[in-house]
Curated annotation (Swiss-Prot):
It comes from the Eukaryota. GO terms for molecular function: water channel activity. The keyword Secreted does not apply. The chain crosses the membrane at residues 43-63, 80-100, 131-151, 173-193, 207-227, 255-275. This is Probable aquaporin PIP2-1. A motif (NPA 2) lies at residues 233-235. It comes from Oryza sativa subsp. japonica (Rice). Expressed in roots, leaves and anthers. Keywords: Cell membrane, Membrane, Repeat, Transmembrane, Transmembrane helix, Transport. NCBIfam families: MIP (TIGR00861). Its main location: membrane. Aquaporins contain two tandem repeats each containing three membrane-spanning domains and a pore-forming loop with the signature motif Asn-Pro-Ala (NPA). Belongs to the MIP/aquaporin (TC 1.A.8) family. PIP (TC 1.A.8.11) subfamily. InterPro entries: Aquaporin-like (IPR023271), Aquaporin_transptr (IPR034294), MIP (IPR000425), MIP_CS (IPR022357). The gene is PIP2-1.
Amino acid sequence: MGKDEVMESGGAAGEFAAKDYTDPPPAPLIDAAELGSWSLYRAVIAEFIATLLFLYITVATVIGYKHQTDASASGADAACGGVGVLGIAWAFGGMIFILVYCTAGISGGHINPAVTFGLFLARKVSLVRAILYIVAQCLGAICGVGLVKAFQSAYFNRYGGGANTLAAGYSKGTGLAAEIIGTFVLVYTVFSATDPKRNARDSHVPVLAPLPIGFAVFMVHLATIPITGTGINPARSIGAAVIFNNEKAWHNHWIFWVGPFVGAAIAAFYHQYILRAGAIKALGSFRSNA
């Protein structure tokens, strides 16, 4: 008998013991009353600032690395300098860990339209909140990359502005698949780390939730930087594209929106309807009310 059955079933056949956790009620599709709540706007501001900081630190790291490894600027030993791909991956994963930890109690710490979209599909956030979050994240990303350009104007355009592009030798299908799988890993980790069922049984999990999320971002970057520069976050991609505003940045830009949203949708379906058996529970509820 599986662990879930031990915890949730018992006694005579067909009888179920009280669950040791409580699933939050699904968020309404449209909650007009939410628009009059200060907590919503506070959360939107938190998402804006968090995404701004995320893009500033990470894109600055990318530009700095490319400058340090540019032989024409840093000498013959440039190839041995810089933080390397590992350092870039740590910058992205580390900033997500820090910012999710700081904002989780205010906005949920999404910092990514794909995460927001996945949580919306799972009825964790309302449509109104999801739209405002995504707008705030995109604006924050644009401002964050704008700061990088302001502070590193001599190198920003020279080194590509941190924009996501499909690397030479890879097809559009490969790039799209990399973004789908990478975002699936991230959003699946978000669902698992914030699962109320897990939180109820492991009291330390809520405190550590930002850690696996940040580590997932780190691992995905190691795998996909050579392919797409790693998007998995439409705000990150559009922020760099808008400020760099080069034809190369916009070419195949759709990959960095379609891929993350598809990956997030698959992760939401997998976690909610397969792992958490949402479809079976809904069918059981329908039969009991029939």
